[in-house]
UniProtKB/Swiss-Prot annotation:
UniProt GO BP: cell-cell signaling; transmembrane transport
Name this polypeptide is given: Gap junction beta-7 protein
An example molecular function term from Gene Ontology annotations: gap junction channel activity
Keyword set includes Cell membrane: yes
GO-annotated cellular components: connexin complex
UniProt cross-references to InterPro entries, sorted A to Z: Connexin, Connexin_CCC, Connexin_CS, Connexin_N, Connexin_N_sf
Native organism taxonomy: Eukaryota, Metazoa, Chordata, Craniata, Vertebrata
Segments in the Extracellular topological domain: 41-75, 143-177
Family assignment from sequence similarity: Belongs to the connexin family. Beta-type (group I) subfamily.
Gene3D superfamilies: Gap junction channel protein cysteine-rich domain
Membrane topology: Multi-pass membrane protein
Stated role: One gap junction consists of a cluster of closely packed pairs of transmembrane channels, the connexons, through which materials of low MW diffuse from one cell to a neighboring cell.
Compartments reported by the entry: Cell membrane; Cell junction, Gap junction
Species this chain originates from: Homo sapiens (Human)
Length: 223
């Protein structure tokens, strides 16, 4: 998936989002995506080639690397960015469907950008819930796969075909840890922003429903 396509996709969704949604978009692209691109190019460029073990046994280095890195950390972050962005397709598809119907019936879809009613409200709400679920799920997955969010400089490996317990060294552990912590913090920030936007939308809908019921309620005239 092209990052430019991803940007255009989310920009189209945010036409109907709240101010919190615009902040979320800025965090994703200014902090997470740009930092990811820098980290992928410079920090995780040749991670397997720079992984060293104090054993020359054929296959030992590859087995130890695969054990500690079952999936590349940088690829996992890329997958997370894609997965937290794709739920916005729900909103895009909903708007595209109604815009097509609007052209056929020559009827205005929404009063103005930022106004969400009916199906659009539900589609946007579901996309927020799914995005939040993916964010939390990937953080838990990352923590479980790598036993935390820090990269050790030394790992012990006793897997076959290693002749005994060998020491393996990871390149740039401090720099990788800093980048990972930054991405974790921005991911947590996105979760908080999603919860704020969810609360705002639900509260706004609740107040709107209460006002509508109050206005429809027949008024008793005093004599």
């Amino acid at each position: 998936m092209s990052w430019m396509f991803l940007r255009d996709l989310l920009s189209g969704v945010n036409k109907y989002s709240t101010g919190t949604g615009w902040i979320w978009l800025a965090v994703v692209f200014v902090f997470r995506l740009l930092v990811y691109m820098v980290a992928a190019e410079h920090v995780w460029k040749d991670e397997q080639k720079e992984f060293e073990c104090n054993s020359r046994q054929p296959g030992c280095k590859n087995v130890c690397f695969d054990d500690f890195f079952p999936i590349s950390q940088v690829r996992l972050w890329a997958l997370q960015l894609i997965m937290v962005s794709t739920p916005s397709l729900l909103v895009v598809l909903h708007v595209a469907y109604h815009e097509g119907r609007e052209k056929r019936h020559r009827k205005k879809l929404y009063v103005s950008p930022g106004t969400m009613d009916g199906g659009l409200w539900y589609a946007y709400l579901i996309s927020l819930i799914v995005k939040t679920g993916f964010e939390i799920g990937f953080l838990v997955l990352f923590y479980k796969l790598y036993d935390g969010f820090s990269v050790p400089y030394l790992i012990k490996c006793d897997l076959k075909p290693c002749p005994n317990t060998v020491d393996c060294f990871i390149s740039k552990p401090t720099e990788k840890t800093i980048f990972i912590l930054f991405l974790v913090i921005t991911s947590c920030l996105c979760i908080v922003l999603n919860f704020i936007e969810l609360s705002f939308l639900v509260l706004k809908c609740f107040i709107k429903c209460c006002l509508q019921k109050y206005l429809k309620k027949p008024q008793v005239l005093s004599v």
